[in-house]
């Protein structure tokens, strides 16, 4: 399974692609951070993010997209930018018919480090170890995007298959009526 992990943000949007499956070694395909200038109007920044996500999906052909689930923080402007970038990423993936997994920060931290309250350094160190990298991905947005992809492969992939089976069973029951 190939997963594109997206750590959404209006200023820095981390994107990382990981190949692998449960019980098998995972492999880094690519990682980067898309940046937009705070000097630009928000709509232009969102278009930049949209084009960046589209380009990554086109280039890497992921089987699924994992996006950090937005949660409330005290800084409303940060939450708004994160939510806007997240929405753009979801629309781009949905337009292509890609399954989308939303994972909370604590779920991602727990998946890669065993501790839902792990710090950025610990998450980065574990991503480096899991993907057998020589150096830690930087900035933290890059490591977070890879952690999202890893989490989706380890957890979300199985959940997506369960959800698909339940949906298929429901449709089968409805068609018999």
Curated annotation (Swiss-Prot):
Top-level division of the source organism's lineage:
Bacteria
Annotated Gene Ontology cellular components are: cytoplasm; Holliday junction resolvase complex
Question: According to its UniProt record, which residues of this chain constitute the active site?
Answer: 7, 68, 141
Q: Which residues take part in binding Mg(2+) 2?
A: 68
The UniProt subunit note reads as follows:
Homodimer which binds Holliday junction (HJ) DNA. The HJ becomes 2-fold symmetrical on binding to RuvC with unstacked arms; it has a different conformation from HJ DNA in complex with RuvA. In the full resolvosome a probable DNA-RuvA(4)-RuvB(12)-RuvC(2) complex forms which resolves the HJ.
* Functional description taken from the UniProt entry: The RuvA-RuvB-RuvC complex processes Holliday junction (HJ) DNA during genetic recombination and DNA repair. Endonuclease that resolves HJ intermediates. Cleaves cruciform DNA by making single-stranded nicks across the HJ at symmetrical positions within the homologous arms, yielding a 5'-phosphate and a 3'-hydroxyl group; requires a central core of homology in the junction. The consensus cleavage sequence is 5'-(A/T)TT(C/G)-3'. Cleavage occurs on the 3'-side of the TT dinucleotide at the point of strand exchange.
Name of the protein described by the UniProt record: Crossover junction endodeoxyribonuclease RuvC
Q: From what organism does this protein derive?
A: Nocardioides sp. (strain ATCC BAA-499 / JS614)
